[in-house]
């Protein structure tokens, strides 16, 4: 049954910016869907607001729209493009919500919804419908009630009994959910949940805390053929911890064959009843003693778990789901890995896969590290091993958190009962301390089987000595359990190179096994490998010219999908140019770990030992470290010292930039100004520097990504507090103390250099003033307020510096501009590698910078690539950052030098105001709210807000302000004075709760985050009220509101903007 001939044009809805609960897995699924449908001759139209995705590259679909993912905007695209069908199931929760919204607006007349019907989405997402649907099937679900008020929640709990799990309907990653053990907790969680559900509904569920959790990925086609992909997955953590927060293993380890059969049958029964055509994820809870099970949830779309199942088996769920959505059947779709089996063969595996989440707690001081029913992790890693112990050890060192294996971590009994992100390490430490498996099981509800595996690792470590490792059998056993050389070195007091030498002397080297979807039953044609210490090696090494690309590992704040984007582009460019490309990475969510992006894929930890072993096996011409963010840059020097050729910019140049004193010498030689600074190894040093250059100063450790431990301090007291904290971050590296340039405009430049010529890819003006981390600030191309002569100076400095550093490939330089001072341009920092703005600049200008950079590294010249004149654009593109505050109770939404954003959205239009408005809408901030504007600013800003107040007044807003702010501008407009929270009721908090306020402008005073400002900002986050914490942001917001009121919002595809 070939594809449905009535479907010739499909609109694919993407998932928008990377956020907690919805990360790179949807770029992977959306990209696969685009490719898959085009293979079938279907015209594809894609809409997504995230510029850092591969799917928004112009060549991925016939037309790509980078527009806000709201039903109103997507309806305009449907009107313009007239697709035959809409595919929402590749866009995560966002895709489903947009599709539901479109249906409610009546915008889907004559357009089919494929993959999952609107009825199916509602049956699964609306809890009452879901429960009654499951009851019709005789499938058990936890007792639950859907409620629309706190009163109803209190009534429901009388029936169900405490503890209850509270979950808002139609949200993502458990946003707003929690476990309530008492009336007070229920009132607090239900209030928050009702605000966050876009249908104002929360579910009060009977608690199945402590039950085991299993997941099944099921595929179904229109012939009703169903298969289970990846047998099943088991969460090591029991119910009560969101599956996205759990350590997950596949195949399941503690499920009996009989129970597996029951859950399999139930999964197939459910997908058939729901009539889903494509992929679906089903989660079950199983009682550890009785084997009783409950259906917890069904996702009628591809998900985080389906990305994991795809990478764990090599079976491309999204690609196959897209073909099924247009009417093809499993038996007609070829398995790309074997090229001879159909997609209806269930994949099987003969290894163990472990997934561990990566959390952002290092970025947010003072917030709870507890994990539970609401997701907090930003990304994840996956590792493959022959045993669970090996797989676990490899996954831990893939996390890139400075741990080369299980490490001793302080714990209390309460920590074991109320898990945090440190859970695995605390369990390991308790076992090492002699606590019994039974006792730990009682506290954690983790199955004794898994505790025994961790105990095996702890026991083996206790037996290792310097002498015992000289026995090759013991060394081989250690390697087979997944111990890294560096871990063995720290356990025995030896150094890593001695362990390596000992290993090589005894010919103990890893071999590589293939991930082939069929446990070696058929021959695989797509080389996708993992390393282990087994006997037979399955890699066929070719004699082609090869390049190895080091990926960027798990998504975390400071190192997001942008770097994966650059790695994929490098692989594509070098493959096009005839090189064999080899990708090394360990992130199951991303496009770079797709089996058909590079010629060979190694799913391995990104450590020196693991990467060197692959290099020794493959013997590439060189290694690319420029694209994988700090993770791959950190490997440049050790790899070069091991004799590996680093392609592109010499690694020596990286040190010339990252070592501050050497960088200053470079700048002095070139005559490029930088802010006064000093280097300090103690508080006394730092105070002396601050006295010499004057407060405020920006303090930070050297060698750091995402501005970690970076702060602006205003006096000695704050400086001393910082030094106590930060010196611990990096003891061997001193602290930098820079003069903070207040009120400067920050500018980012991405450029290409081939060693002789420089091409300026894009100059971005930041909208937030200097002092907000460049990864968090909104920015705009082309610059809107910077005079031409200053732009020329910036270009000149960029050229000089790129040539001096002998850059081959990409360089990113950040400047601070003070137009009225002399000098007017200061350099802040330079990074001779891909930056997080590369995808945005590429989308804004239409020039694929990362691809070009890869070609330059292989010897091409800018002239040959046609890059002589930089590209002027007629439109305006704005990048806005997206923050995780809503997912992290207690986090302050103030922006500063430490990066806090997880992702980005882009707005593009003919004028700045509308482009900025689109960028805000894409970041879930609708500026066109009704309501008053509330303004409260710190003392040093009070004389700078006249124009803001005037503009708000001209736009017809009623303005509220606190007394001090109102006094400063009372002659400009009528201001309603409102009390601070600390001044008694009625106050600003009451006004916000009553829905009077539609926009909040609040600049933070000092560092007391417990102040009124913090409370207001936190309420804005939780209630979804647009807020800005900088004056520049406020000006941009008001200009955007004006532009939208005056003009019409139109949609255009990228190829229309780029005149193609």
UniProtKB/Swiss-Prot annotation:
InterPro entries given in the database record: ATP-grasp (IPR011761), ATP_grasp_subdomain_1 (IPR013815), CarbamoylP_synth_lsu (IPR006275), CarbamoylP_synth_lsu_oligo (IPR005480), CarbamoylP_synth_lsu_oligo_sf (IPR036897), CbamoylP_synth_lsu-like_ATP-bd (IPR005479), CbamoylP_synth_lsu_CPSase_dom (IPR005483), MGS-like_dom (IPR011607)
Positions bound to ATP 1: 127, 167, 173-174, 206, 208, 213, 240-242, 283, 297
Gene3D superfamilies reported in the protein's UniProt record: 3.40.50.20, ATP-grasp fold, A domain (3.30.1490.20), ATP-grasp fold, B domain (3.30.470.20), Carbamoyl-phosphate synthetase, large subunit oligomerisation domain (1.10.1030.10), Methylglyoxal synthase-like domain (3.40.50.1380)
Binding residues for Mg(2+) 4: 829, 831
Cofactor: Mg(2+); Mn(2+)
GO cellular component, one term: cytoplasm
Region (Oligomerization domain): 401-539
Keywords per UniProt: Amino-acid biosynthesis, Arginine biosynthesis, ATP-binding, Ligase, Magnesium, Manganese, Metal-binding, Nucleotide-binding, Pyrimidine biosynthesis, Repeat
Region annotation Carboxyphosphate synthetic domain: where it falls in the sequence: 1-400
Residues at which Mn(2+) 3 binds: 814, 829
Domain of life (superkingdom): Archaea
Residue span of region Carbamoyl phosphate synthetic domain: 540-926
Residues the entry annotates as binding ATP 2: 700, 739, 741, 746, 771-774, 814, 829
GO biological process: 'de novo' UMP biosynthetic process; glutamine metabolic process; L-arginine biosynthetic process
Annotated residues for binding of Mn(2+) 4: 829, 831
Cofactor: binding comment: Binds 4 Mg(2+) or Mn(2+) ions per subunit.
EC code(s) of this entry: 6.3.4.16, 6.3.5.5
Enzyme class: ligase
Domain notes: The large subunit is composed of 2 ATP-grasp domains that are involved in binding the 2 ATP molecules needed for carbamoyl phosphate synthesis. The N-terminal ATP-grasp domain (referred to as the carboxyphosphate synthetic component) catalyzes the ATP-dependent phosphorylation of hydrogencarbonate to carboxyphosphate and the subsequent nucleophilic attack by ammonia to form a carbamate intermediate.
Subunit and interaction comment: Composed of two chains; the small (or glutamine) chain promotes the hydrolysis of glutamine to ammonia, which is used by the large (or ammonia) chain to synthesize carbamoyl phosphate. Tetramer of heterodimers (alpha,beta)4.
Protein's UniProt name: Carbamoyl phosphate synthase large chain
UniProt organism field: Methanothermobacter thermautotrophicus (strain ATCC 29096 / DSM 1053 / JCM 10044 / NBRC 100330 / Delta H)
Gene: carB
């Amino acid at each position: 049954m070939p594809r449905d001939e009535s479907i010739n044009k499909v609109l694919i809805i993407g998932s928008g910016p990377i956020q907690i609960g919805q990360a790179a897995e949807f770029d992977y699924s959306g990209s696969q869907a685009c490719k898959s449908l085009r293979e079938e001759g279907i015209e594809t139209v894609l809409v997504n607001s995230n510029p850092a995705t591969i799917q928004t590259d112009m060549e991925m679909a016939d037309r790509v729209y980078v527009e806000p993912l709201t039903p109103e905007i997507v309806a305009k695209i449907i009107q313009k493009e007239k697709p035959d069908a809409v595919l929402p199931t590749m866009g995560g929760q966002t895709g489903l919500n947009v599709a539901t919204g479109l249906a409610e607006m009546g915008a889907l007349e004559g357009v089919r919804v494929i993959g999952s019907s609107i009825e199916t989405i509602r049956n699964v997402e609306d809890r009452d419908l879901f429960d009654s649907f499951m009851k019709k099937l005789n499938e058990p679900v936890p007792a639950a009630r859907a409620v629309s008020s706190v009163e109803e929640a209190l009534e429901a709990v009388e029936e169900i009994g405490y503890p209850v799990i509270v979950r808002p309907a139609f949200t993502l990653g458990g946003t707003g959910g929690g476990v309530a053990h008492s009336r007070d907790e229920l009132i607090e969680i239900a209030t928050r949940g009702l605000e966050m559900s876009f249908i104002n509904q929360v579910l009060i569920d009977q608690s199945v805390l402590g039950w085991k959790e299993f997941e099944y990925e099921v595929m179904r086609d229109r012939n009703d053929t169903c298969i289970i992909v990846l047998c099943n997955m088991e969460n090591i953590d029991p119910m009560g911890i969101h599956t996205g927060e759990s350590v997950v293993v596949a195949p399941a380890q503690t499920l009996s064959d009989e129970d597996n059969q029951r859950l399999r049958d139930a999964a197939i029964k459910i997908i058939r009843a729901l009539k889903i055509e494509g992929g679906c994820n089903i989660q079950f809870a199983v009682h550890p003693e009785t084997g009783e099970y409950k259906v917890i949830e069904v996702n009628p779309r591809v998900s985080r778990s389906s990305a994991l199942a795809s990478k764990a088996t090599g079976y491309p769920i999204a690609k196959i789901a897209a073909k099924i959505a247009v009417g093809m059947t499993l038996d007609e779709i070829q398995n790309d890995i074997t090229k001879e089996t159909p997609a209806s063969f269930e994949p099987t595996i003969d290894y163990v896969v472990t997934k561990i989440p990566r959390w952002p707690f290092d970025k947010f001081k003072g917030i709870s590290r507890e994990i539970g029913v609401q997701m907090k992790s930003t990304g994840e890693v996956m590792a493959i091993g022959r045993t669970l112990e090996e797989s676990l050890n490899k996954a831990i060192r893939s996390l890139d958190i400075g741990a080369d294996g299980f490490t001793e971590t302080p714990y209390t009994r309460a920590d074991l009962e109320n898990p945090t992100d440190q859970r695995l390490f605390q369990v390991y430490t308790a076992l090492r301390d002699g606590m019994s498996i039974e006792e730990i099981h009682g506290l954690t509800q983790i199955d004794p089987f898994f505790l025994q595996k961790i105990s095996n690792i702890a026991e083996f470590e206790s037996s290792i000595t310097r002498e015992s490792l000289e026995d090759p059998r013991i060394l081989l056993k250690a390697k087979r359990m997944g111990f890294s050389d560096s871990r063995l070195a720290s356990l025995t007091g030896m150094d890593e190179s001695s362990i390596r030498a000992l290993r090589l002397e005894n010919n103990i080297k890893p071999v590589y096994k293939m991930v082939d979807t069929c446990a070696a039953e058929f021959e695989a044609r797509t080389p996708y490998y993992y390393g282990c210490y087994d006997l037979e090696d399955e890699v066929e090494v070719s004699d082609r010219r090869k390049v190895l690309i080091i990926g960027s590992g798990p998504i975390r704040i400071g190192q997001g999908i942008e770097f994966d984007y650059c790695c994929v582009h490098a692989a594509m460019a070098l493959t096009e140019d005839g090189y064999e490309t080899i990708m090394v990475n360990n992130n199951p969510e991303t496009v770079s770990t797709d089996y058909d992006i590079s010629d060979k894929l190694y799913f391995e930890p990104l450590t020196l030992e693991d990467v060197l072993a692959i290099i020794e096996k493959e013997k590439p011409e060189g290694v690319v470290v420029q694209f994988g963010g700090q993770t791959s840059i950190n490997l440049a020097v050790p790899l070069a010292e091991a004799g590996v050729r680093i392609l592109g910019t010499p690694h020596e140049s990286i040190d010339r930039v990252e070592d501050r004193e050497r960088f200053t010498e470079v700048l002095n030689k070139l005559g490029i100004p930088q802010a006064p600074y000093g280097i300090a190894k103690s508080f006394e040093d730092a105070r002396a520097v601050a006295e010499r250059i004057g407060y405020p100063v920006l303090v930070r450790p050297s060698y750091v990504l995402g501005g970690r431990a970076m702060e602006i301090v205003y006096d000695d007291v704050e400086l001393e507090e910082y030094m106590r904290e930060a010196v611990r971050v990096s003891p061997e590296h001193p602290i930098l103390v820079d003069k903070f340039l207040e009120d400067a405009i920050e500018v980012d430049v991405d450029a290409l250099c081939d060693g002789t010529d420089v091409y300026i890819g894009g100059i971005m003006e930041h909208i937030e003033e200097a002092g907000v981390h460049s990864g968090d600030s909104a920015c705009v191309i082309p610059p809107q307020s910077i005079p031409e002569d200053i732009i020329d100076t910036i270009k000149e400095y960029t050229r000089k510096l790129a040539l001096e550093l002998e850059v081959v490939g990409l360089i990113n330089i950040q400047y601070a501009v003070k137009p009225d001072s002399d000098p007017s341009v200061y350099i802040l920092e330079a990074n001779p590698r891909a930056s997080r703005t590369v995808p945005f600049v590429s989308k804004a200008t239409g020039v694929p910078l990362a691809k070009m950079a890869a070609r330059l590294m292989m010897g091409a010249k800018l002239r040959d690539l046609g890059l002589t004149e930089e590209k002027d654009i007629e439109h305006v593109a704005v990048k806005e950052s997206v923050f995780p505050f809503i997912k992290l109770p207690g986090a302050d939404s103030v922006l500063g030098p430490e990066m806090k954003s997880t992702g980005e959205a882009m707005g593009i239009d003919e004028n700045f105001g509308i482009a900025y408005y689109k960028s805000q809408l894409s970041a879930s901030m609708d500026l066109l709210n009704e309501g008053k504007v509330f303004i409260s600013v710190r003392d040093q800003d009070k004389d700078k807000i006249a124009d803001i107040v005037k503009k708000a007044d001209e736009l017809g807003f009623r303005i509220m302000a606190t007394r001090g702010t109102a006094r400063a501008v009372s002659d400009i407009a009528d201001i309603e004075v409102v009390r601070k929270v600390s001044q008694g009721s009625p106050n600003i908090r009451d006004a916000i709760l009553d829905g009077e306020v539609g926009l909040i402008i609040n600049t933070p005073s000092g560092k007391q985050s417990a102040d009124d400002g913090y409370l207001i900002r936190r309420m804005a986050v939780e209630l979804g009220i647009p807020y800005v914490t900088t004056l520049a942001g406020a000006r941009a917001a008001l200009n955007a509101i004006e532009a939208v009121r005056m003009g019409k919002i139109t949609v255009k595809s990228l190829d229309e903007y780029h005149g193609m």
